[in-house]
Every structure is written in structure tokens, then in C-alpha cells.
A protein has these predicted regions:
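Transmembrane signal-anchor hairpin modules in multi-pass inner-membrane enzymes, especially those
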Residues: 1-90, 111-122, 126, 174-181, ...
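Long extracytoplasmic/lumenal interhelical loops at the membrane interface
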Residues: 146, 268-283, 287, 291, ...
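Perimembrane helix-loop-helix junctions
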Residues: 52, 56, 210-234
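Transmembrane alpha-helices of multi-pass inner-membrane enzymes
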Residues: 45-46, 345, 369-417
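A membrane-periplasm/extracellular boundary helix in multi-pass inner-membrane enzymes
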Residues: 199, 223-268, 283-291
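Aromatic-anchored transmembrane helix interface
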Residues: 67-79, 88-111, 123-132, 154-166
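Alpha-helical transmembrane segments of multi-pass inner-membrane proteins
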Residues: 25, 116-147, 155-222, 246, ...
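Hydrophobic transmembrane alpha-helices and their immediate junctions
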Residues: 312, 333-374
Length: 417
């Protein structure tokens, strides 16, 4: 049975059970319905406020926790300041609400600490594997019957690619479990995550796969397998061959599209393609930042300020809601300071993991942090990074989860029998 149904005894059992349910389903749902992730995060924040005000538990944040929480909070504070500096103000409440996930660590980390060390992270990793398997099957049905690029439940192919990459990678960390069921879910979950990446046609996510492989080599070199390397090699090879066969059409289609876009750029015939549109947005963003590097334009004026820097004949052909680069987006929103605080926030999971005492918990936290940061930085340099209803809660929740356990924690299997 799954340990989610059997929290420890004592006064913290109800909170522990609720924590387990929240963490487990948060890991399952991103590719199926990201709105539920936002709901889980918001509900956890409200519960945290209630429990702190009624003294059911204390804030209980270490010096390292506070450093991470402050690093997370500076980014939204700078963005809110930029919103107030730059009119119009009609969207101020909406933007403040959208930035709330980045403050959540102050509330959900003390709540997570009501569960025993080593309980929540294994639940999340198992949930990620299960979620990726279900999401992949959903994506496969879309490709077979409906869509050119799979979206699963995300309504955005690029978002599915990022989620598949990150949560598939997280799922594979469970291959070291002593339980064969968890090992199978880990391998299938990783393969399913890669399948989602391929079926979504998210080219920026393809770039992250080699980086993740290096992270896995570092992590698994330090920790023994309960699965024989021969079995792992055979299973992995078969799954890899199956994924390539399944996704070859999508891979070739996306490569051909990129080649066509590059050929159009060389011809300089004025045709606006996906690639030329992004390059135009980058140029417009750099030009806009150079004109107001101190305060930026505020997120409410983001695209208007970029489009104002582009020729009149190109503007109507760029129906994008973001610049396709997270760092340039932060620079437009709040100037050079915006880029700096974004970079700081991206470092917070690594800071939280690195500052733990040595042990299995620290190694796992570092692996999670590296998977998280590399996924966001690389894909976010070519597409979506933050200010997105799914990616913001995922980042905030994972940062809290990374900080939750001590570095010396030993993790037990979730499946007990």
C-alpha cells in the first residue's frame, strides 16, 4: 500500500496526511490540469496562514530557509514596485495576485515541516512518474486523432515539453528504490516524460536532455542501484528505441520547420516565420531595455514596449504574449534590476540544497535543484519561464520541497507492500 494513506501517529497526523495528499497530487497533475496545481498551492497557503495564526505550528524557518525565502520574495517585490512606477494601474490587482506564488514558501515550508523527514519527497517523485505515464498516454491520443503537436491537459505544447522534461527527470530519481514497482514507475515515467517532450515538438526542451543526463550520472554515481545495470541498460535501450520510432515523425517535422525558417532568414524576403519573429522580439526587447534600464516598463506594458521598437510592417504579424526569453522579459518589466533578481531567484533552489548538511537528503535535494534550474533556464531562454499559471506554482512548490528535509535524511520507499 502507498504510505500516503498511513501518516505517522501523533498530533501532526492530520497535517501529515494532508501534506502527503497535496504533494502526491501536485506531482501527478501538471501535465493533466495545471490549474489544479495553482489551486493546491493556494489552498496550502491559506492553510498555512490559518495554522500560523492559530499557533498550530510555528514559522520554524532556519537561517538557510530564510535566505531562500528572501531570495524568492525579492523578485515579486521588484515586479510589484515596477507595476506601481509605470502606469496604467488598472491591472495592478491582477498582477499582484499572479505574483503571489513566489511568496508561498513562507507559508508552505512550515506546513511541510509537520511531516516527518523523508516522507514528502519520495511521494512527489513517485507521483511525478505516475503523472508522466498518464500524461504521455493522453498526449499519444492527441497525436493519433487530433493535433499536430501534443498539449495533453496544458493547452500549450511548449508547456507540455517543459513539464515532461522536468517531471520525467524527477521520476527517474526513483530508480534507486529497493521496490521493483517504484523502479518500473521511475523508468516508465522518465520514458513517458521524454515521450511528451518529443510529441510536443518543444525544441528548446530537447537541448536540456543532455544536461539532465550529466546530472543523473553525477547523482547515481554516488548512490547504489537495487536494479542490475544489465537490466537497466536493456530496458532503457528498448524504451529509447521505442521513443525514437514513435516520435521520429514529430522530430523530423520540427527540424524541417527550423531549416525552413533559417532558409527564409537567409533569403531576407520579408517573410515572418517563427524564428524571424523571435529574433525581432529579442531585438525589440534589447532596444526597449537600453532606453529604460533602471525601472523598466512594468509587466502590464511588456509587449507594447517591445512592439514599439519594431517596424510598423512587422508588428501586426507578431501575435505573441511574451518575448520568448525569460531574462529579457524580466529586463523589460523592471530593467537591469529585474534581470538580477530573476537570476537570484533561479539560484534559490541550489542555495537551499547546497547549504544542507552532507548526506543522502542533501544529494537528492541538489539533484532536484539542478533538474529544476536547468529546465527553467534553458527552456526559458527560448520560450516561457515565469509569469505563467503553471510554471510559477511548480517552481515555488519545488523550492519549498527541496528545503523541507535535512541533508542527513534517509528516504524510505513509498510502496510498502
Amino acid at each position: 500500500m502507498i504510505a500516503i494513506l498511513h501518516p505517522g501517529n501523533g498530533t501532526g497526523s492530520t497535517l501529515d496526511r494532508n501534506n502527503g495528499i497535496a504533494v502526491f497530487f501536485f506531482a501527478i497533475l501538471p501535465g493533466l490540469s495545471p490549474n489544479f496545481n495553482s489551486f493546491i498551492l493556494l489552498a496550502s497557503m491559506v492553510s498555512g496562514i490559518y495554522c500560523l495564526t492559530t499557533a498550530r505550528f510555528s514559522l520554524n524557518l532556519s537561517k538557510s530557509d530564510r535566505l531562500v525565502a528572501i531570495g524568492m520574495s525579492i523578485y515579486p517585490l521588484v515586479m510589484i514596485a515596477s507595476i506601481f512606477i509605470n502606469p496604467p494601474y488598472s491591472e495592478v490587482p491582477d498582477w499582484i495576485f499572479r505574483l503571489l506564488p513566489f511568496f508561498s514558501i513562507w507559508l508552505i515550508l512550515p506546513r511541510m515541516r509537520q511531516s516527518p523527514d523523508g516522507r514528502l519527497v519520495p511521494l512527489f517523485i513517485l507521483g511525478a512518474g505516475i503523472g508522466m505515464i498518464i500524461t504521455f498516454l493522453f498526449s499519444l491520443l492527441q497525436i493519433m486523432f487530433l493535433m499536430e503537436r501534443a498539449e495533453a491537459g496544458t493547452s500549450n505544447a511548449a508547456l507540455l515539453g517543459i513539464i515532461g522534461l522536468l517531471f520525467g527527470g524527477i521520476a527517474l530519481l526513483n530508480v534507486q528504490s529497493p521496490r521493483s514497482v517504484e523502479q518500473r514507475i521511475a523508468i516508465l515515467g522518465y520514458a513517458a516524460g521524454l515521450g511528451c517532450v518529443l510529441l510536443s515538438g518543444t525544441r528548446s526542451a530537447w537541448l536540456v536532455i543532455p544536461v539532465h543526463i550529466v546530472i543523473f550520472l553525477w547523482y547515481f554515481r554516488k548512490h547504489s542501484f537495487h536494479l542490475s545495470l544489465r537490466s537497466l541498460a536493456i530496458t532503457g535501450s528498448l524504451l529509447f528505441a521505442g521513443l525514437i520510432a514513435l516520435g521520429s515523425g514529430q522530430i523530423l517535422h520540427r527540424i524541417e520547420a527550423l531549416q525552413a525558417n533559417m532558409a527564409s532568414l537567409e533569403r531576407s524576403d520579408g517573410e515572418v516565420t517563427s524564428l524571424s519573429a523571435r529574433l525581432a522580439l529579442y531585438k525589440g526587447a534589447v532596444s526597449a531595455i537600453s532606453k529604460d534600464p533602471l525601472t523598466g516598463y512594468g509587466p502590464q506594458n511588456r509587449m507594447a514596449s517591445v512592439l514599439a521598437e519594431l517596424p510598423d510592417n512587422i508588428r501586426p504579424q507578431l501575435p505573441y504574449s511574451h518575448v520568448h526569453n525569460g531574462f529579457l522579459t524580466a529586463g523589460i518589466d523592471a530593467g537591469v534590476l529585474g534581470i538580477a533578481v530573476l537570476s537570484l531567484m533561479l539560484l534559490t533552489p541550489l542555495i537551499g540544497a547546497w547549504r544542507k548538511e552532507p548526506g543522502p537528503g542533501r544529494d537528492l535535494a541538489i539533484a532536484l535543484a539542478l533538474l529544476l534550474v536547468s529546465s527553467y533556464v534553458i527552456t526559458g531562454s527560448f520560450g516561457i519561464m515565469f509569469n505563467q499559471k503553471a510554471l510559477d506554482p511548480i517552481f515555488a512548490y519545488l523550492v519549498a520541497l527541496i528545503c523541507a528535509d535535512r541533508g542527513s535524511t534517509n528516504f524510505a520507499p513509498v510502496v510498502r507492500c
